C-alpha cells in the first residue's frame, strides 16, 4: 500500500531483483513498481521487457497471490515459480490464529481478553518450538492440557512442522518434511479443523512452488520484505506521497542500488 486515500488504487506491485543475493554480490535491489496488484499489472510489466531479458529470468519468487504465478507462467514460461518461506509460514500462522479465535469464541462467547489463556498465548503459539523457554513450554503444556484447546494444539503442531522443515539444515531432508506435511493436510483432515483443511487445499494447489524453494537457495522473498520495510520508512519520513511517479522515483533512489554509485562515482 503506497497511500491511504479513498480514491484511486492504493496498491503497487513491487518487483525486486534477487540476483545479487543468490550470487553473493550484494543486497537485493528494487527494479520497478507498478500501480495495482493484479495479474494484468505484472503481466503487462513483464511483456514490456525485452525478450532477451525475459528469456534470462530463471526463477520468480512470489507470495501466495495466484495472479502473479499466472502472469509469470504466461510471460516467462521457462522460469521456475517459487513460493517463498515467509508467505508459506504466514499461511500456517494465519490458520493458527483463525483456529485460536474460533475456539476462543466457542468457549467464552467473546473475543480474546487479557486474562483468557488462548489470548495470552497468542504470541507464544507463533514461536518456534526450538526457541521456547522452559517457562513457555510449561505454559503450553498447561494450555494444551485443557481438552477444549485440542483443535488449537493440532493446528499448532502443523505450524511447527512447517517451521521445522524450513529450519532443517539439509535441504533434501527439509523438502521431504515439507512434502510429508503437505500430504498429511491434503486429505483426511477432521471436519472440525476447517482452518487446517483450507490450508491443506492451498498448499496442495501450490505444492510444486512451495517445494521448489528447497532446490533453489537464495530465492526467499525475505529481501523483498526488507525492501518493503525501507519503503514504509521512506513514506513515513516524507509524510506520505500524493504522486505515484514521485514515489517510484524516490523508492528507486533509496532501494534501487544507485545510491553508492551517486555517492562514490567511479572516475576515469
Where do the language-model regions lie?
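Basic, amphipathic alpha-helical segments enriched in Lys/Arg and hydrophobic/aromatic residues
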Residues: 186-268
Amino acid at each position: 500500500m503506497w497511500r491511504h486515500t479513498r480514491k484511486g488504487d492504493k496498491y503497487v506491485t513491487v518487483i525486486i531483483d534477487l540476483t545479487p543475493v543468490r550470487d553473493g554480490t550484494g543486497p537485493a535491489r528494487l527494479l520497478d513498481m507498478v500501480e495495482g496488484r493484479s495479474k494484468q499489472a505484472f503481466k503487462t510489466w513483464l511483456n514490456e521487457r525485452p525478450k532477451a531479458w525475459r528469456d534470462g529470468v530463471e526463477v520468480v519468487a512470489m507470495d501466495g497471490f495466484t495472479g502473479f504465478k499466472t502472469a509469470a507462467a504466461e510471460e516467462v514460461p521457462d522460469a521456475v515459480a517459487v513460493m517463498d518461506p515467509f508467505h508459506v509460514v504466514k499461511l500456517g500462522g494465519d490458520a493458527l490464529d483463525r483456529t485460536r479465535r474460533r475456539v476462543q469464541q466457542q468457549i467464552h462467547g467473546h473475543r480474546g481478553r487479557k486474562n483468557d489463556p488462548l489470548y495470552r498465548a497468542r504470541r507464544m503459539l507463533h514461536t518456534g518450538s526450538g526457541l521456547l523457554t522452559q517457562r513457555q513450554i510449561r505454559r503450553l503444556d498447561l494450555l494444551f492440557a485443557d481438552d477444549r484447546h485440542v483443535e488449537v494444539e493440532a493446528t499448532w503442531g502443523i505450524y511447527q512442522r512447517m517451521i521445522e522443515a524450513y529450519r532443517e539444515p539439509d535441504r533434501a531432508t527439509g523438502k521431504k518434511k515439507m512434502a510429508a506435511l503437505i500430504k498429511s493436510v491434503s486429505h483426511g483432515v477432521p471436519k472440525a479443523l476447517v482452518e487446517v483443511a483450507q490450508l491443506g487445499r492451498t498448499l496442495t494447489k501450490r505444492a510444486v512452488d512451495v517445494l521448489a524453494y528447497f532446490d533453489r537457495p537464495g530465492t526467499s522473498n525475505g529481501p523483498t520484505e526488507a525492501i518493503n520495510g525501507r519503503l514504509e520508512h521512506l513514506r513515513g519520513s516524507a509524510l506520505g506521497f500524493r504522486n505515484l511517479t514521485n514515489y517510484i522515483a524516490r523508492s528507486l533512489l533509496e532501494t534501487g542500488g544507485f545510491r553508492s554509485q551517486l555517492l562514490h562515482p567511479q572516475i576515469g
